[in-house]
């Protein structure tokens, strides 16, 4: 059984502590893929949920003073339960508040994968970095940032951009699938965090090949969505992306994946 078949067979529970803007899209995307999202945010039920969950996604897009302690509590409970965590430090370089929170979170919680654009990942290892928001700086050296971040933070790193870079231990892989229309819909990167979590299967030390598959399945679905005859802009692309995630299979993944080890 390949990983995509396993995902659909097991229908893994993925707890999504994600931002308010993208909850609906993230949930629908994971359902289309074959996972079972739970948008649970209460620390009081975190022990029960993380015990059953395949993974926990934490996305700080709408971080507030009111929820920051809950995020850390839930992360610590997931650690106690042995549940892998995907961490998405959205716009961490945009404010000192976000930088300080991420520094604290990563100091108190062990994460399995950190996903972000080059600017966000750079900020995690160089807190003097500034950025205007969630946008990535295309001139940054994503390969070296990923390598340094993986070593410094001792976790798997996924950097998104025109090409995606995955770094784990001393191995680095560049992926070249995707669609420019992903940048025209809100929550595309946030959904990718959920897709990564769906592929973890309670594994806190996933292989880099598993991470490659998760990212590539999503990006290949985006390519196919862009190419659909009726897609003529962001709105039709968004709905078609859900359909392509639903239709994705292992043969298509293996035939279409564009990857190279660096």
Swiss-Prot record:
InterPro entries, alphabetized: Hyethyz_kinase, Ribokinase-like
Signal sequence extent: none
Residue numbers binding ATP: 115, 160
GO terms (BP aspect): thiamine biosynthetic process; thiamine diphosphate biosynthetic process
Keyword match Kinase: yes
One Pfam family of this chain: HK
Cofactor needs: Mg(2+)
Superkingdom as given in the UniProt entry: Bacteria
EC nos: 2.7.1.50
GO molecular function: ATP binding; hydroxyethylthiazole kinase activity; magnesium ion binding
The keyword Zinc is assigned to this record: no
Classification via SUPFAM superfamilies: Ribokinase-like
Keyword field: ATP-binding, Kinase, Magnesium, Metal-binding, Nucleotide-binding, Thiamine biosynthesis, Transferase
Role summary: Catalyzes the phosphorylation of the hydroxyl group of 4-methyl-5-beta-hydroxyethylthiazole (THZ).
Family designation: Belongs to the Thz kinase family.
NCBIfam families according to UniProt: PRK09355.1 (NF006830), thiM (TIGR00694)
Protein name as it appears in the record: Hydroxyethylthiazole kinase
Lineage: Bacteria, Bacillati, Bacillota, Bacilli, Bacillales
